[in-house]
């Protein structure tokens, strides 16, 4: 409400965690109804296919190649240098989960002992820069589409 009261009519929540998607989507039902215009839940990845940027993974998973590359691009000092020797399991128990055909959720400990659910060893600052650039360009493209902002609620 506070943002809308200031006159903003183009509002997007840039979501940085997959676990937040469902609760944000549920909240947007009431928010959109109350405000009378659409507010969007947009993952910062904005639908970018990460696979062309990656060597050992096809998509983002916790502390894997994508996330570690992004943090390296932001500030290398935040990443423990031992990441080059670490990897974890993919997080999915089946190909169906890995490709997104279905999902379920568990405590992190049931998937990984070290918090890594991907191939952090394949991360690089260069990949992180390229991914961040692709995400930003896609966010601009998506959010600049005027059709989004005229959808009735």
Q: For the regions a protein language model found, what residue spans apply to each?
A:
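Extended, histidine- and acidic-residue-enriched regions that form the cofactor-binding/catalytic faces
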Residues: 1-12, 18-153
